[in-house]
């Protein structure tokens, strides 16, 4: 078994890789402009809105498809994006998970499955200070409170050329 780890801009790395060379990609893509990771203008987190984010993703997603071997998976760590009353006019959620799935499907990927990663709402409340999850908000304005937000690992599969799939097999360990 061999593997390689890359620490570089994903668009740079993908463009240099040959076709059908990756068995598994595990990534946590930026959640649009929810967090800013650097001041680099190429950074996907430095977008002004979701439209700009998905316009940028439209360059990366086909490259990920090209370099992924047929039948293999990309695992995407995601979360829903909260909206804020001051910025967005109301507190709620944007279905970022669904938007990412649709963006990948547009480029030929198949939605293969997902894993829900439940998080402790008390830790989330302490970390984010989000009024919608704080106990004090619940006591005063219960109608604005929500549950804690889980993360998701969305699994997308490259389904093409099934006759070329290299099947994964496991020896029976009971023998």
Q: Where is each model-derived feature located?
A:
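Core catalytic lobe of class I
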Residues: 1-175
